[in-house]
């Protein structure tokens, strides 16, 4: 019996680990830690929490994902995809609500892994993924306009449309120096890769703009550039572990947000791991990765952190700088911890406009406009799912977008599946490719009073409706209906219900149903549903020639 393997990749790595591997991982871990720093701060603030919570998340989640994960090079931490969800949860349920929702999401992720749902999650329709990712990107960009241009607004509306109306009404309050810092930050981040692939543009922008803001304040008396320290009390103290008080009412109210965090985290982490596999030629264990992500999201909020997942940008940075084992991810977490302990107080000098610039670039990278445009050329059903998910994300929230998007995608999928199932009527002789030998061809003439139908494809509710319509189109009432099912791979509960109704209606009309060529799988499903109690075992035939013989016997008696 095959065992359920949830062994972390780290254990296999250590068997053949050597000094050369360590030196590569050390360099990659240091660079990824430096890259993760400004992103963790920016994601924390944009999510509505303090900057240190973003870094704490990167440390705790980054360490645990690398320690327990199913990917050798995955880097975990806070990501832009969670900004919208976290901000919405805090607004509605407060920080404690976010903590409980994140813990619940961690439990869900662990269950996903234990139930081996890792491969299934990968099947979430691509238009939904692109739709909500693009919607999140637009939302992140929208939330940064105030800080990017230094607008004077007491309270920014939460509604997307109202937010933009507010920005337009207050754009005259834009601060020149904040705008310069924000725009220059975007430019620096965008052009840095042209000069160096190793140095993260976001770090360069933060260093340059922080120094510039300090010089402008010191020597030019310009104090209008708001910094992190103006908005938050920055601390480098490691928070104590705090377990929130959970009530049944709170848990019930947070199921939907927690499930959204879990599903989004699962999608993003497995997508990141899959992309990384393609680059280094490896294969991750999806279920182990989900368990690791779950543990990370259980632990992170206990230290005051926020939801975390696998981060594609940091994972690719890890690969590009030589990281090939989980040790690189662990080193990245240690580097972040050292920076947090010794340099965190300096973060208070970072301009808010600069962080807004960092997030503008993040939102551009997330939007995936090329994929969006490409999908717009796909079938209308895909375009419908894409646009509905996209607009629901920016107008309402991600929870609604994913739920509605999945429902619509499922309905459209079922419609497509029903269209692939073909029901045809055989009028005179059965002489096409057959499941019997040519020697028995004389037995294949259809007797008077007998109708033969052949179903090709899965038999479920869509096919059942099609079948009923075809039968209703015949004016004459036969004595026997043979349903040939040799090409039916499976039948669902709706299909069984449809067949049951068909048998009962036919019996009332004096018509006998005979099944032919039922596969072992479908036979087992029908038997389990006690369908044969209605039909009768004598009306189940393994081949069409036997079904025709049975039909002749029934007709002769009537």
Language-model features, listed with the residues they occupy:
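Transmembrane helical cores of multi-pass ion-transport proteins
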Residues: 1-427, 432, 530
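Short, contiguous clusters of charged residues that form electrostatic/catalytic patches at enzyme active sites
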Residues: 28, 186, 190, 465, ...
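Active-site-adjacent beta-strand anchor residues
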Residues: 76, 131, 515-516, 541
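Generic hydrophobic alpha-helical segments
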Residues: 86, 164, 467-471, 547, ...
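The feature marks cytosolic C-terminal regulatory regions of anion transporters and related permeases
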Residues: 365-534, 552-558
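Short acidic-hydrophobic, aromatic-tinged amphipathic segments that line or gate anion-handling sites
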Residues: 534-550
